[in-house]
Each structure stands twice: as C-alpha cells, then as structure tokens.
C-alpha cells in the first residue's frame, strides 16, 4: 500500500509546475481526494473541508500570486496511510510583486486510494513530529 500512496502523492503534485497548470488540472487533482477531504493550513489553523473547500483554498492561494509553482523535493513514505511531501513554493506576490521562495511540508493521509487529509507545515520539526519521523 505504501508505494501506491507515494504514487498518489506524486500524481497530486504533477501539475504544480505552474499556476496555469494547477488551475487547469483542478478537476483531475480533486478526483484524487475523498469527497470529505480535509486540509489544515498553518497560517491560522483553518481546516478546509470537502473537495469544494480544498479547491477553493487552492484557488485563493494561487490568486495571491502572479506567478507560482511548487517544486517537490522529496516524498517520504511514513508507513501506514501517510506520506510526507517536502516542497519549495516559488512565486511572485500579486499585490507586492515580491519574490517568494519558501520550504513547506504537507502530510497526506491516504485511504482506499484517496487523499482524506492534508496537513501543511512550515516548520521541519513540526512536520516530522506529526509524521512520526525523525529528521
């Protein structure tokens, strides 16, 4: 099951090479999610629920950038139902024009071939702890 989970995570991030590709692939990426998927973000701890909520989160996030891409650095099989994805967000803010480059982590829980939960982290220690891993 673990290799299958890594493959699902890989498909989730495939269109992340550009903002345009992410938006165009939204129906395909949402199909990888369980209808009641949950995504918790670190900014304020908000949890977006359901495919519609997750889709809205992605669209709002992408709207805050003129240019955006997500570069997967590695996908770690955590065993069981989880994979930890380390990535780099690269973009230019829509309002400020400022260049952004930031590392983040997303812990995906996958059951029966579908993403059921995404927890996002900006702190390496927090991400590895949540995944039950050591850095």
Task: Describe each model-derived feature in a short phrase.
Residues 12-16, 40, 92:
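Alpha-helix C-capping/helix-to-loop hinge sites
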Residues 26-81:
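A solvent-exposed, acidic/Ser-Thr-rich amphipathic alpha-helical stretch
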Residues 13, 17, 33, 62, ...:
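Generic secondary-structure transition motif, activating predominantly at the C-termini of alpha-helices
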Residues 17, 21, 38, 66-67, ...:
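Generic structural signal for secondary-structure transition and capping sites
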Residues 1-32:
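Short acidic-aromatic low-complexity motifs
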Residues 1-4, 8, 59-135:
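A beta-strand edge to alpha-helix "cap/lid" segment located at domain peripheries
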């Amino acid at each position: 099951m673990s290799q299958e989970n890594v493959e699902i995570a890989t498909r989730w991030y495939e269109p992340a090479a550009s903002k345009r590709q992410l938006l165009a692939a939204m129906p395909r990426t949402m199909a990888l999610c369980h209808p009641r998927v949950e995504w918790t973000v670190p900014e304020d701890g908000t949890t977006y629920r359901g495919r519609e909520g997750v889709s809205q989160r992605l669209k709002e996030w992408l709207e805050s950038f003129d240019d955006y891409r997500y570069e997967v650095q590695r996908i770690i099989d955590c065993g069981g139902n989880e994979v930890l994805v380390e990535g780099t967000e690269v973009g230019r803010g829509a309002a400020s024009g400022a260049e952004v480059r930031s590392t983040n982590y997303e812990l995906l829980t996958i059951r029966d071939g579908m993403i059921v939960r995404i927890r996002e982290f900006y702190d390496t220690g927090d991400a590895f702890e949540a995944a039950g891993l050591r850095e």
